[in-house]
Regions:
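Eukaryote-skewed repeat-based solenoidal scaffolds used as protein-protein interaction platforms
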Residues: 1-5, 13-18
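Amphipathic alpha-helical segments of tetratricopeptide repeats
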Residues: 19-23
Length: 286
């Protein structure tokens, strides 16, 4: 709309938002939403239920942002890897695991690609760098209480994002390493729901496996069938600092359930320390 109406004030607002979003694209074209309140309906290549980012970023590229065209190129390459028999699968390993695709992903993203193809061509003169290509140490996004780390071949996301979705237990909050990625290995792990539930069944992949385990590193106590974890704690203190070439996070948290209740024995305090360097990450706790 901003482009069609030549509303440059609105375009500037959208531009700043899209530039910030681009900070969260991984070097292989994946979108990092490991920290988000609605990450339960996202997958490695982006939003499972949305059309995608390509139309808007293509207009940005045409204006003055060639790096947006590079982002589209890398993401298309990822979509291609997840497409089999003309259908886009909801995860990079679904096809190999025998998990059926949902047609929603295919028609949603086909629509986004069509919106790009009907626009005037933009010449791509050279491959542009994306923000997470650079080794910059650490960036803090205060509004979402989330840090992006880039050291050597490692990329990581650390979050204490304490905004709850309308359904509790959907995303990590209490000082969590929500994503770890390596240039050669790709994703080592990414955060999952704190407790797996089909809270929006039409927008989520059904699961038929007998055993499920959360994919977010955490401290957890199960008592009388109730999980108490630092991932659900809204009263977490996080300190980030640089020391001797390490980016360190000191986290003081509590084991609570999704309703912020402590176990029977009372308040359980924990301290977890993370140290990031070019060699990797180490985690210790008390």
């Amino acid at each position: 709309y901003a482009v069609m109406a030549n509303d440059m004030e609105l375009f500037s607002l959208v531009e700043r938002s899209m530039e910030t979003h681009l900070e969260f694209m991984l070097p292989d074209g994946a979108w990092d939403n490991s920290w988000g309140t609605r990450s339960f309906k996202w997958t490695y290549w982006g939003g499972r239920t949305s059309d995608g980012f390509m139309g808007g970023y293509y207009l940005m590229a045409a204006a003055r942002h060639p790096e947006c065209l590079e982002a589209i190129r890398r993401n298309i390459r990822l979509l291609s890897k997840a497409t089999h028999g003309g259908l886009l699968y909801g995860g990079m390993h679904y096809f190999a695991s025998g998990v059926s695709p949902c047609i929603h992903h295919t028609f949603g993203h086909a629509k986004a690609l069509a919106s790009v193809l009907e626009l005037p061509p933009v010449k791509m003169t050279s491959l542009e760098k994306l923000p997470r290509d650079s080794v910059y140490g650490v960036k803090h996004f205060k509004d979402i209480r989330t840090w992006l780390l880039s050291q050597g071949d490692w990329r990581a996301t650390f979050t204490g994002y304490d905004a709850e979705y309308k359904v509790k237990g959907t995303h990590p909050m209490g000082g969590a390493l929500s994503l770890l990625w390596h240039a050669q290995a790709g994703p080592i792990f990414a955060a999952t729901m704190n407790q797996y539930k089909l809270i929006e069944a039409p927008n989520m992949q059904d699961n038929v496996r007998k055993y499920l385990m959360g994919g977010t590193p955490r401290v957890e106590l199960t008592q009388d069938g109730v999980a108490y974890s630092n991932l659900d704690d809204l009263n977490t203190d996080i300190t980030c600092f640089i020391e001797n070439g390490f980016c360190r996070f000191n986290v003081n948290s509590h084991l609570v359930d999704i309703n912020q209740q402590s176990p029977k024995q009372g308040e359980v305090l924990i301290e977890v320390n993370y140290a990031f360097s070019e060699q990797g990450v180490s985690i210790s706790m008390e």
